[in-house]
Amino acid sequence: KLSEEDAAAIPYREGQTVKFLNQVGDTLTYQLVRDEIYPYNGDQYINAINGVDVMHPAPHSTECYARTVILICEEWDAKRLCFTARPEKEFSFHSDDLDLNICLLPNGPYTINGIDYEHVHHEILYSHYTGELLYDWYYNEEFGLLYFKKGDFSLTRIP
Protein backbone atom coordinates (compact mmCIF):
# COMPACT_ATOMS: atom_id res chain seq x y z
CA LYS A 1 0.00 0.00 0.00
CA LEU A 2 1.13 3.55 -0.67
CA SER A 3 1.82 5.35 2.61
CA GLU A 4 0.44 8.82 3.28
CA GLU A 5 4.01 10.11 3.36
CA ASP A 6 4.77 8.66 -0.08
CA ALA A 7 1.50 9.99 -1.53
CA ALA A 8 2.28 13.42 -0.04
CA ALA A 9 5.48 13.63 -2.13
CA ILE A 10 3.16 15.20 -4.71
CA PRO A 11 1.66 18.30 -3.05
CA TYR A 12 -1.02 19.02 -5.66
CA ARG A 13 -4.68 18.47 -4.70
CA GLU A 14 -7.98 18.22 -6.57
CA GLY A 15 -9.19 21.49 -8.06
CA GLN A 16 -5.85 23.21 -7.52
CA THR A 17 -4.28 25.52 -10.08
CA VAL A 18 -0.56 26.23 -10.27
CA LYS A 19 1.00 29.18 -12.08
CA PHE A 20 4.32 29.18 -13.89
CA LEU A 21 6.28 31.63 -16.02
CA ASN A 22 7.33 30.13 -19.34
CA GLN A 23 10.52 30.82 -21.28
CA VAL A 24 9.22 34.11 -22.75
CA GLY A 25 7.76 35.42 -19.49
CA ASP A 26 4.12 34.52 -20.12
CA THR A 27 2.08 33.22 -17.18
CA LEU A 28 0.72 29.70 -17.70
CA THR A 29 -1.98 28.36 -15.41
CA TYR A 30 -2.02 24.59 -14.92
CA GLN A 31 -5.10 22.83 -13.57
CA LEU A 32 -5.05 19.51 -11.77
CA VAL A 33 -7.22 17.22 -13.91
CA ARG A 34 -6.41 13.80 -12.49
CA ASP A 35 -5.42 12.48 -9.06
CA GLU A 36 -5.56 8.74 -8.67
CA ILE A 37 -4.15 6.06 -6.36
CA TYR A 38 -4.18 2.67 -8.03
CA PRO A 39 -2.53 -0.78 -8.04
CA TYR A 40 0.72 -0.22 -9.89
CA ASN A 41 2.59 -2.16 -12.50
CA GLY A 42 4.38 -0.97 -15.63
CA ASP A 43 1.30 -1.13 -17.86
CA GLN A 44 -0.78 0.91 -15.41
CA TYR A 45 1.95 3.55 -15.25
CA ILE A 46 2.05 3.91 -19.04
CA ASN A 47 -1.75 4.21 -19.12
CA ALA A 48 -1.77 6.77 -16.29
CA ILE A 49 0.79 9.13 -17.82
CA ASN A 50 -1.01 8.98 -21.16
CA GLY A 51 -4.32 9.94 -19.57
CA VAL A 52 -5.94 6.55 -20.15
CA ASP A 53 -8.28 5.17 -17.52
CA VAL A 54 -6.24 2.90 -15.31
CA MET A 55 -7.61 -0.62 -15.41
CA HIS A 56 -6.99 -2.56 -12.23
CA PRO A 57 -4.53 -5.38 -12.89
CA ALA A 58 -4.90 -8.97 -11.81
CA PRO A 59 -3.66 -9.39 -8.21
CA HIS A 60 -0.57 -11.32 -9.32
CA SER A 61 0.56 -8.42 -11.54
CA THR A 62 0.27 -5.70 -8.90
CA GLU A 63 3.72 -4.58 -7.81
CA CYS A 64 2.53 -1.93 -5.34
CA TYR A 65 0.25 1.11 -5.23
CA ALA A 66 1.05 4.45 -6.80
CA ARG A 67 -0.40 7.95 -6.96
CA THR A 68 -0.46 9.81 -10.26
CA VAL A 69 -1.36 13.47 -10.64
CA ILE A 70 -1.75 15.18 -14.02
CA LEU A 71 -1.77 18.94 -14.57
CA ILE A 72 -2.63 20.50 -17.92
CA CYS A 73 -2.61 24.00 -19.35
CA GLU A 74 -4.85 25.20 -22.16
CA GLU A 75 -2.04 27.13 -23.87
CA TRP A 76 -1.20 25.57 -27.24
CA ASP A 77 2.53 25.14 -26.56
CA ALA A 78 2.37 24.12 -22.89
CA LYS A 79 3.51 20.67 -21.91
CA ARG A 80 1.36 18.36 -19.82
CA LEU A 81 2.87 17.66 -16.39
CA CYS A 82 2.48 14.23 -14.81
CA PHE A 83 3.84 13.18 -11.42
CA THR A 84 3.81 9.63 -10.03
CA ALA A 85 4.84 8.59 -6.52
CA ARG A 86 5.42 4.97 -5.51
CA PRO A 87 6.49 3.44 -2.17
CA GLU A 88 9.81 4.54 -0.69
CA LYS A 89 9.35 7.89 -2.44
CA GLU A 90 10.29 6.50 -5.81
CA PHE A 91 9.13 9.33 -8.01
CA SER A 92 8.55 9.91 -11.71
CA PHE A 93 8.03 13.13 -13.63
CA HIS A 94 6.68 12.97 -17.16
CA SER A 95 6.20 15.87 -19.52
CA ASP A 96 5.13 14.88 -23.02
CA ASP A 97 8.43 13.67 -24.49
CA LEU A 98 10.36 13.35 -21.21
CA ASP A 99 10.15 10.69 -18.51
CA LEU A 100 12.38 10.96 -15.44
CA ASN A 101 12.67 8.50 -12.57
CA ILE A 102 14.37 9.54 -9.38
CA CYS A 103 14.39 8.84 -5.68
CA LEU A 104 13.17 11.92 -3.91
CA LEU A 105 16.24 12.62 -1.83
CA PRO A 106 16.61 16.36 -1.40
CA ASN A 107 20.10 17.55 -2.15
CA GLY A 108 20.09 21.10 -0.92
CA PRO A 109 18.47 24.47 -0.48
CA TYR A 110 18.11 26.55 -3.65
CA THR A 111 16.90 30.03 -4.56
CA ILE A 112 14.48 29.98 -7.48
CA ASN A 113 12.73 33.06 -8.84
CA GLY A 114 14.02 35.01 -5.81
CA ILE A 115 12.57 32.61 -3.22
CA ASP A 116 14.60 30.33 -0.95
CA TYR A 117 13.41 26.72 -0.81
CA GLU A 118 14.68 24.01 1.55
CA HIS A 119 14.82 20.28 0.82
CA VAL A 120 14.95 20.63 -2.95
CA HIS A 121 15.75 17.83 -5.34
CA HIS A 122 17.72 19.05 -8.35
CA GLU A 123 18.30 16.93 -11.43
CA ILE A 124 20.32 18.07 -14.44
CA LEU A 125 21.54 16.11 -17.45
CA TYR A 126 23.79 17.01 -20.37
CA SER A 127 24.29 15.02 -23.57
CA HIS A 128 27.40 12.84 -23.45
CA TYR A 129 27.87 13.48 -27.17
CA THR A 130 27.27 17.20 -27.63
CA GLY A 131 27.44 18.64 -24.12
CA GLU A 132 24.02 20.19 -24.76
CA LEU A 133 21.64 20.58 -21.81
CA LEU A 134 18.98 17.86 -22.05
CA TYR A 135 16.96 18.88 -18.99
CA ASP A 136 17.21 20.73 -15.71
CA TRP A 137 14.57 20.65 -12.99
CA TYR A 138 14.00 21.45 -9.33
CA TYR A 139 11.31 19.84 -7.18
CA ASN A 140 10.18 20.25 -3.58
CA GLU A 141 7.66 18.05 -1.73
CA GLU A 142 5.97 21.05 -0.14
CA PHE A 143 5.52 23.15 -3.31
CA GLY A 144 5.98 20.69 -6.19
CA LEU A 145 7.72 21.63 -9.42
CA LEU A 146 9.83 24.76 -8.92
CA TYR A 147 11.66 24.95 -12.24
CA PHE A 148 11.85 22.84 -15.39
CA LYS A 149 13.83 23.36 -18.59
CA LYS A 150 14.08 21.16 -21.65
CA GLY A 151 15.25 22.57 -24.95
CA ASP A 152 13.63 25.94 -25.58
CA PHE A 153 10.79 25.23 -23.13
CA SER A 154 10.96 26.24 -19.46
CA LEU A 155 8.64 26.72 -16.52
CA THR A 156 9.36 28.64 -13.31
CA ARG A 157 6.92 28.40 -10.39
CA ILE A 158 5.06 31.58 -9.46
CA PRO A 159 4.31 31.58 -5.70
PLM features per residue range, with description:
Residues 1-159:
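Conserved functional acidic sites
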